[in-house]
Amino acid sequence: MKKYKIGYTTGVFDLFHIGHLNILRRAKEQCEHLIVGVSTDELVKDYKHKTPVIPFEERIQIVEAIRYVDEVVPQTSMDKFAAWERLHFDAIFHGDDWKGSAMYNEIEQKLNAVGVDMVFLKHTQGTSSTEISKKLQGD
């Protein structure tokens, strides 16, 4: 029996790499049903101020094809509490590179108050979509 019934994680999943796969695998190891929110192009433009290399519809298909993923939903907002109200997960998974940030401290308190655990998973060192993009651009 896994620790959580429904888990949730989110990401852009642009230029899909081993770090993305590791987060999805580690999350699935802890929950029976893993829901993954894939950030829409509009959301990425709003908070990262750049357009993903891979279009949203293709990123959705890539994530849906991963065996650790049970369900994929569009992430149209950074509001994790609103996502909980819609999806009713009992754990939310994030890379530990977010741990301690003001935004995540606040949302962790709100989610804990309704019985949701925020689980930080070890970030895969040395790999990121930003670094891959820089290499492709010759930086």
Please give the residue ranges for each predicted region.
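Nucleotidyltransferase catalytic core that binds NTPs
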Residues: 1-139
